[in-house]
Every structure is written in C-alpha cells, then in structure tokens.
C-alpha cells in the first residue's frame, strides 16, 4: 500500500489488517521506529494528549497517533474493554478487581492499579462474568 505519511484512510486499513492478525503497531517514544507487537502483549492503552500510549506487559511503552475511540472500535472483538475516558484494558492481564466506591472499580494489572469509572463498570462486569 502506497500513501503519504498522513493518509488516515490507509492508516486505518493497515490498523484493521494488523488486528485481524492479532497485532498492533506503535512507535518507540521519541523515535520514528515502528514496532509491531502481539495484542496479547499489551496490558493497557491510555491517552496522553494527542497520543495513545500502549503499555506492554514488560513495562515498555509505545505510542500511536490513533484516537482511543478508533482503537476501541478496532479492538471490539478482543479482550480489551474501555475502563474510563482515557483507558482501554486487556482483561487477560487483569489479576484482581476490587470495588472502589461510588460504583468504580480498581483493576490490578501486576503492580499497576487502574481505576475503572462507574460508567464502564457494568460492561467490565459483564465481560468477566460477574453479572
């Protein structure tokens, strides 16, 4: 596929093709080096300004220019679930869940704990089989 560097249509097509193969790509922060990783290796994704930060289970980070809503749409049939306006979490990496009050939930991913907002709690419960 040939295109200009900012052709969002082609970027979207490439992103969807990678998802079919169970992979996602991102840039190593501060470089132009693109790296392809398995979806299974991604623990969570969060927004940081105009960048989606892909957090790998190893602790490494990659960056993507895709919007979180685009990634959510692309990852809809995978283990990823929206947990807040800023985050998507791979449920395969969740090691514990606790109530956090006001309908929120604490999701443990190894040593990292993320807060799931009340808005997304029911979908998380449904996906893990609590409801």
Model-derived features: where do they sit?
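…primarily DNA-binding HTH/wHTH and HhH modules…
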Residues: 129-130
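Conserved binding/recognition cores within well-folded domains
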Residues: 7-109, 115
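Short beta-strand-to-loop capping motifs
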Residues: 1-5
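Glycine/charge-rich catalytic "coupling/switch" loops of P-loop NTPases
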Residues: 126
């Amino acid at each position: 596929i040939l295109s200009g560097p900012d052709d969002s249509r082609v970027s979207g097509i490439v992103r969807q093709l990678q998802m079919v193969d169970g992979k996602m790509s991102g840039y190593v922060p501060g470089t132009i080096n693109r790296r392809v990783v398995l979806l299974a290796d991604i623990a969570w994704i969060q927004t940081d300004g105009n960048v989606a930060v892909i957090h790998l289970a190893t602790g490494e980070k990659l960056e993507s220019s895709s919007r979180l809503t685009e990634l959510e749409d692309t990852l809809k049939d995978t283990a990823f679930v929206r947990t807040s306006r800023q985050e998507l979490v791979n449920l395969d990496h969740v090691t514990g869940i606790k109530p956090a009050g006001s309908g929120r939930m604490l999701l443990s991913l190894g040593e990292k704990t993320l807060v799931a907002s009340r808005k997304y709690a029911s979908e998380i419960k449904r996906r893990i089989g609590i409801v």
